[in-house]
Amino acid sequence: MILVLVMQNKFKRKDFLKLALLTNLALMAKPLEVFSEKFADLNFPSSNDNVRYFKKGDADYNLLRKGFNKRIDKFPLIIALCKNTAGVTEAVKYAKQNGLPVAIKSGGHCMEGFSCNDGGMVINLSLLNKIEWIDANNIKVGPGCTLSNIYDEIIPQGKMLPGGSCAGVGIGGLTLGGGYGLLARKFGLTCDSLQEITMVDGKGNTINSANDKELLWACRGGGNGNFGVITEMKFKLFKAPAWLQSYRFKSYKVDTKKAKTVLQKWFQVTANLPTGCFSAFVLNRKTIYILLTNVDKHNAAVQKVVDTLSALTEKTTKTKPQPITTALKVFYGRSEPLYFKNASAGLYKNFADIEACIDKTIDTVIATPGMIYQVNTLGGNIENVEAEKVSAFPHRVFTYFSELQTYWDFPKQEAPLLQKFEQVQMLFIGNGIKTQYRNYPDINFKNWSDMYYGANFLRLQQIKNKYDPENIIRHEQSIKAR
């Protein structure tokens, strides 16, 4: 059976209201500043059934330009809200003809706002949100589908696509940068399930990866805003786990010595974590929070982890196994945009990788309100050798991924928090942590090409040369043609 979920054929006002709800962008519009005179040199494109264009001053412009991170405030010259591949083609050709850089937005969750720009064109893919069943084990989706859209469609059919836990994230950006989550250790990265893509390249040509396996390789972990605009993605699916059980372990009022001891022991106990399990260590000021989830049968190996972490911390909370749909929604997270910075703080093989700098890191986190240091388990089927051969994601040898986060309520709090944030990042980099996850970018990474892509960068650059030699598709850390 082929089931297609589509938006209405014609653009209507209510479509944009729905879009606001789906992408969590229903924000108060700020007063408009005087915009660039650049339009004096352009013929503003006409909207049609394939694409609708917006400029500053239009009713939906502010709604469409904003993303999940309120820290990012950019003003594109034109927003192209595309309905299909033809609309994307038209928008890219217009941008190319008029020398406008193109940023691509599916869910708007890029940590550094690379899905928007100042003075260029943003191609908004929110309406490319079809889900089509090819057969019982494969689907085609538009890049504008959010994770919750996909989960709500496939889990009732007993199927799973390993993705993240944040409901509003777009499948396009998640996949193109790798894509990990609670089920990655069991099923692999999101990009490992990617079978085929359709893309409009920087020349305005429509390309299908069935005719270019090198392009598919690149889009499995190396494709974020680099080569073109993805308009369709084909994924293989797995049998969905029936249940998910979670455990939460907490310690309070910890000092640096205690936090370091718990973290070191957590590394040891998770080194041989069962494949169906995921764990995260979280330090939020003086509180330690450890999450453990399991989608396989509870056995002695899982119980050993539970017992060790319980003995190490002060409070253990155990949930009964829940249906996978219900359990995942617990982790969907906040839907409203907020002020924050969240970036990769390195990929590790073990505690020894950070031992030299972890004391100062913990000192800073404990002393800084709003700052969080988190380490997540990788490994399991992410380390799949066959997947490594056919994907650009370069970090499978690492079994842990860390992230640094900081949050605030008012703009005046931003500068001192970002200063502390950068201090911690420099601690890691100064102690040899130089491998980073592209889906959690940091605008301050200097050698980002090596950090994100490693030895694969030159190969990715060759693909950029082929599909976008004029560098039309670009952002602050996109791969540039040579």
Where do the protein language model's features map onto the residues?
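Soluble FAD-dependent oxygen oxidases
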Residues: I2-R482
